[in-house]
């Protein structure tokens, strides 16, 4: 039997989906802009 694929880890989560990572690329900034437009309470992880 194989283990579950999702092993939660806050540091890894922030390093891959965090605000600073998103701001690094044009596409990432677009994601944040879209979430702001939509009115998301949380923009990033």
Swiss-Prot record:
Gene3D superfamilies given in the database record: 1.10.287.3980
Gene Ontology CC terms, in alphabetical order: ribonucleoprotein complex; ribosome
GO-annotated biological processes: translation
This protein's record includes keyword Ribosomal protein: yes
Superkingdom as given in the UniProt entry: Bacteria
UniProt keyword annotations, A-Z: Ribonucleoprotein, Ribosomal protein
InterPro entries per the UniProt record, alphabetical: Ribosomal_bL34, Ribosomal_bL34_CS
Signal peptide from the UniProt entry: none
Membrane-spanning intervals of the chain: none
Entry annotated with the keyword Ribosomal protein: yes
GO molecular function: structural constituent of ribosome
One Pfam family of this chain: Ribosomal_L34
Family annotation (NCBIfam families): rpmH_bact
Recorded family membership: Belongs to the bacterial ribosomal protein bL34 family.
Protein name: Large ribosomal subunit protein bL34
Protein's organism: Acidothermus cellulolyticus (strain ATCC 43068 / DSM 8971 / 11B)
Gene name in the database record: rpmH
């Amino acid at each position: 039997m194989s283990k579950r694929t999702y092993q939660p880890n806050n540091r890894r989560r922030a390093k891959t989906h965090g605000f600073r990572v998103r701001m690094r690329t044009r596409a990432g900034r677009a994601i944040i802009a879209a979430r702001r437009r939509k009115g998301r309470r949380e923009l990033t992880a």
